[in-house]
């Protein structure tokens, strides 16, 4: 069947679309980057004084892609080549996923379905530099998930 977004072709195009969308929404600052050590890609933007930091894991997507497309000795190339391809696919796919997620959130805000804070609360950065969700998790403010 394949994974959603596995055939996405341009991470740069998705980044440009996100930037254009957020600028039209009224954001003052926009940045993207990559943590080579963790394989995480990020988008950061500021809206009305609130800094938002969105992260996505190219490695996480690559792992899912490898489950969907396991390496076989019948394939051209080595296992390392196949894993490198998975990471490349993941790097493009996660920006497309972020683009669609941000578009959904911005649309929900614009039509009055939710507020900016409701849409992005867990990703808003606190003055300490950690996100709201990271702070909540560190303080153990949420009950543990049930095993049901």
Per-region residue spans from a language model:
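A short, surface-exposed helix-loop junction/capping segment
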Residues: 1-6
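Compact, well-ordered interaction domains used in eukaryotic information-processing assemblies
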Residues: 11-61
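Intrinsically disordered, low-complexity regulatory regions enriched in serine/threonine/proline
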Residues: 55, 62-148
């Amino acid at each position: 069947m394949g994974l959603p977004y596995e055939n996405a072709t341009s991470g740069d195009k998705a980044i440009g679309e996100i930037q254009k969308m957020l600028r039209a929404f009224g954001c003052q600052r926009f940045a993207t980057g990559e943590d080579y050590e963790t394989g995480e890609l990020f988008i950061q933007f500021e809206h009305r004084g609130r800094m938002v930091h969105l992260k996505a894991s190219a490695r996480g997507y690559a792992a899912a892609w490898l489950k969907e497309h396991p390496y076989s000795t019948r394939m051209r190339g080595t296992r390392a080549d196949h894993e490198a391809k998975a990471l490349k696919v993941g790097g493009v796919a996660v920006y497309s996923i972020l683009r669609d997620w941000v578009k959904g959130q911005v649309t929900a805000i614009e039509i009055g379905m939710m507020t900016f804070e409701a849409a992005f609360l867990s990703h808003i950065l606190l003055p300490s530099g950690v996100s709201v969700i990271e702070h909540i998790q560190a303080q153990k403010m949420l009950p543990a998930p049930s095993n049901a």
